[in-house]
Amino acid sequence: MKPSKLFNPFEEIAGAKALFFGFVVMLITGLTGYFSFTHFPDMISIKYIPEYLPLSYYFVQQVVIWLIPSLIFYVFALIGSSSSVRVVDIFGTMALARFPYIIAAVLGFSGSMKRFGDYLMALFMEHDTTATISTFDIVTAIVVMFLMLLLTVWLVALMYNAFRISSNLKGGKAVGLFIAGLFISIIATMLVNIWLYGLWA
């Protein structure tokens, strides 16, 4: 596979095909997240919370962080594009764009993030000077955080290309509408997920 395909597979995979593979991606991400305690509190955030919640919560969360942005970007595509925009293209490519977060869910199996978080909490919030953590856990947690950052950048790049190609937009208009859609989507998915968490927790 060419490196460019990792950031823009949508020239070859779009429409119903992208939607199908996108659903598979969300299914795998939700299932893996359930076992690794990986949450996605908004469309781009990743959190590892060792808390038992039903599998249905993880699947609904995947739907929320895909459906809301897809709706928002579809509206923005209709506003900005002079050509016809197919619903299935926007929704399909936005679903497929989430495939980097399968890796994020797998990273949740590392307990180092939890131990690092507990250590910082004890040290700075509880002022527990006896708190300890291994060098291995610190290094692993830092590596995981760095990988999370790369995965987030990868996701955003994929979503931009999905929006740009599906809406037939270019240049400043594509960038401006995407940034606006991204900001609104983050806020909207965060608020809905807070409400959902309250229902399941």
Residue ranges with predicted function:
Residues 1-53, 76:
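N-terminal juxtamembrane cytosolic/stromal segments of multi-pass membrane proteins
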Residues 5-25, 88-99, 172-179:
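Alpha-helical transmembrane segments and their helix-start/interface "positive-inside/aromatic belt" motifs
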Residues 15-19, 47, 51-59, 63, ...:
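Hydrophobic, aromatic-rich alpha-helical transmembrane segments
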Residues 22-30, 58-71, 94-98, 102, ...:
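Alpha-helical transmembrane spans of integral membrane proteins, capturing the lipid-embedded, hydrophobic core
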Residues 34-44, 109-122, 195-198:
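Membrane-helix interface motif
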Residues 49-123:
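Alpha-helical transmembrane segments with an aromatic anchor "belt"
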Residues 89-178, 184, 188:
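Hydrophobic alpha-helical transmembrane segments and adjacent short intramembrane/lumenal linkers
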Residues 187-201:
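Juxtamembrane boundary at the C-terminal end of a transmembrane helix
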